């Protein structure tokens, strides 16, 4: 008996599951099903498959090949895009470039988590989204403030707190499922631009950094926030409570929406707005709404005044493996290099 399998289609029109496939289904047959599901003409189909997504050869010479032979397996996600039809008087383009494919993959992959909110800020709401992400209410209180309180959502104090926090502000979930994907996204971006991400910027070679950031025990910081801000098309404002300032990543890109993270010197937590006990927490806010930003500034000042931060240059640590006392991050790192000890506790 021939085993059946399915694939997922992700397109601007929406997301679809194609179930009635088997190991003998041809690429030509799948093309027909994609056309039926997405209403895109066969001659204008542009399909990406795999991770990182790569363009699928849809030429007539390939149409009789079985799906598995062209690299499509059960459970695969296919990113489907419509190529612009060439103008009658213009020469036919030679095809999309690698840069086009990478930009397309980033755009559609980010769409599942952030596109609906981007469109809410500047146009009609898309019908294709699987779910609506939390967004701040439009009602304003006195002085333009939102009718809600900006609060900290505590996330696990592990090596992925930055990625967990970003996942929460994008989709309202506290889990570690998106950390590996975000690390991979960052590594791809860095590897693709060795001139910008050189040894001086990274503190290590480009290749070493790309391997390092994909390890589960590597911390994220400014470089990673900047890349993810650009990838998701949203401003990420990091509220630095040690210095009582807000670092706006993506400010120069004029994004329409922003999220807030709280940083105490060693740990990130996401910020959200609670508008009522029954409403879902709001985590994404229009940039032009200054009331929320002012709340974040106030929170930073209050946290600094009460010293709710860790000064990584002056805090005192104890090595939990040999009981030696250390002052600051530099001493701790040097001790770790010399001894291999990695378990420290703050005193």
UniProtKB/Swiss-Prot annotation:
Q: Which UniProt keywords apply?
A: Hydrolase, Metal-binding, Protease, Thiol protease, Ubl conjugation pathway, Zinc, Zinc-finger
Return the EC number: 3.4.19.12
Stretches the record annotates as S2 site: 290-295
Q: Where is this region: Variable-loop?
A: 213-223
The segments labelled Cys-loop in the record are: 155-161
Q: Which GO terms describe its molecular function?
A: cysteine-type deubiquitinase activity; zinc ion binding
Q: Which domain of life is it from?
A: Eukaryota
**Active site per database record:** 158, 161, 267, 341
Biological processes, Gene Ontology terms: endoplasmic reticulum unfolded protein response; ERAD pathway; positive regulation of double-strand break repair
Protein name per its UniProtKB record: Ubiquitin thioesterase Otu1
**Described purpose of this protein according to its UniProt entry:** Hydrolase that can remove conjugated ubiquitin from proteins and may therefore play an important regulatory role at the level of protein turnover by preventing degradation. Involved in the regulation of DNA damage repair.
What region holds the OTU domain? 150-274
Location of the Ubiquitin-like domain:
5-87
Region: His-loop, residue numbers: 263-267
Region feature UBX-like, mapped onto this chain: 8-89
Tell me the residue numbers annotated for binding substrate. Answer: 266
The protein's matches in Gene3D superfamilies, at most eight in alphabetical order, are given as: 3.90.70.80, Phosphatidylinositol 3-kinase Catalytic Subunit, Chain A, domain 1
Null allele outcome, as annotated, is:
When irradiated with X-rays, adults display increased wing and eye abnormalities. Third instar larvae exposed to X-rays do not display any changes in pupation or eclosion. RNAi-mediated knockdown in third instar larvae results in reduced survival in response to UV radiation.
Q: Where are the C2H2-type Zn fingers located? A: 317-341
Catalytic activities = Thiol-dependent hydrolysis of ester, thioester, amide, peptide and isopeptide bonds formed by the C-terminal Gly of ubiquitin (a 76-residue protein attached to proteins as an intracellular targeting signal)
């Amino acid at each position: 008996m021939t085993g059946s399998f399915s694939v997922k289609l992700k397109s601007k029109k929406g997301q679809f599951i194609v179930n009635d496939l088997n190991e003998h289904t041809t690429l030509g047959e799948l093309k027909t099903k994609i056309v039926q599901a997405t209403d895109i003409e066969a001659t204008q189909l542009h399909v990406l498959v795999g991770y990182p997504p790569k363009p699928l050869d849809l030429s007539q010479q390939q149409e009789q090949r079985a799906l598995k032979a062209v690299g499509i397996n059960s459970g695969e996600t296919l990113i489907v895009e419509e190529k612009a039809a060439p103008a009658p008087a213009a020469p036919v383009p030679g095809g999309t470039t690698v840069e086009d494919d990478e930009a397309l993959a980033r755009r559609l992959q980010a769409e599942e988590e952030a596109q609906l909110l981007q469109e809410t800020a500047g146009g009609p709401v898309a019908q294709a989204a699987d779910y609506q992400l939390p967004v701040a209410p439009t009602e304003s209180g006195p002085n333009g403030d939102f009718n809600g309180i900006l609060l900290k959502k505590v996330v696990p104090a592990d090596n992925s707190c930055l990625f967990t926090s970003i996942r929460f502000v994008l989709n309202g979930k506290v889990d570690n499922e998106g950390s590996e994907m975000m690390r991979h996204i960052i590594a791809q971006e860095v590897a693709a631009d060795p001139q910008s991400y050189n040894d001086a910027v990274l503190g290590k070679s480009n290749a070493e950094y790309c391997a390092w950031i994909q390890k589960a025990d590597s911390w994220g910081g400014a470089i990673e926030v900047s890349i993810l801000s650009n990838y998701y098309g949203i401003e990420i404002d990091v509220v630095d409570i040690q210095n009582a300032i807000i670092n706006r990543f993506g400010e120069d890109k004029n994004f329409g929406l922003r999220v807030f993270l709280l940083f105490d010197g060693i740990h990130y937590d996401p910020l959200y707005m609670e508008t009522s006990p029954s409403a879902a927490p709001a985590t994404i806010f229009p940039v032009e709404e200054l009331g929320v930003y002012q709340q974040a500034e106030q929170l930073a000042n209050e946290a600094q005044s009460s010293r709710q931060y860790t000064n990584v240059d002056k805090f005192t640590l104890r090595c939990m493996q040999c009981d030696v006392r250390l002052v600051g991050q530099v001493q701790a790192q040097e001790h770790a290099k010399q001894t291999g000890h990695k378990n420290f506790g703050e005193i």
